């Protein structure tokens, strides 16, 4: 696998992702959050999946939090999903229908997706300390309007590193307010 590192001078997640689209030479584009690690077979799993599912236009996988400290007692299923992007849809490959989507921090797309639906909206997505979001959902919604299949791939595992600073009420309030603005 060939890797190319480039620098995007415009600050923001959507700008970086769009730069990746422009720079990439392959057919499959993979996006992983910068505060995460993946399982050893991550890229080979994705490559094999797209070979086996030629109809698939995008896929996302499981996301498990790795806390730098203990998970707080106040954490519920709902706060965990918001703060950590936790996702576990089971052990089978499934087509994500209706309002089900992968997380953008653990997603792979065929290049054709961006030729057909456009790029990530730079007015959305993380930018500096702003926690706005929704740029991936906009892409996924556009894909679903065109009936482009999106799958959940359980063996596409991402471990999301959660620092203590994200386990505070202040962070949670800022996050939910930002999501509401998005």
Give the ranges of each region predicted by the language model.
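A short, conserved alpha-helix in the catalytic core of glycosyltransferases
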Residues: 104-109, 113-118, 123-156
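Glycine-rich, basic loop-to-helix element that forms the pyrophosphate-binding segment
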Residues: 8-24
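Short aromatic/hydrophobic "clamp" motif used to bind/position activated sugar donors
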Residues: 29
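Acidic donor-binding segment of Leloir-type glycosyltransferases
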Residues: 1-7
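Short, flexible, basic/aromatic active-site loop/helix in glycosyltransferases
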Residues: 78-100
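Conserved donor NDP-sugar-binding/catalytic core segment of glycosyltransferases
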Residues: 41-75
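Catalytic core of nucleotide-sugar-dependent glycosyltransferases
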Residues: 145-148, 155-156, 168-182
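The conserved acidic donor/metal-binding loop of glycosyltransferases
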Residues: 33-37
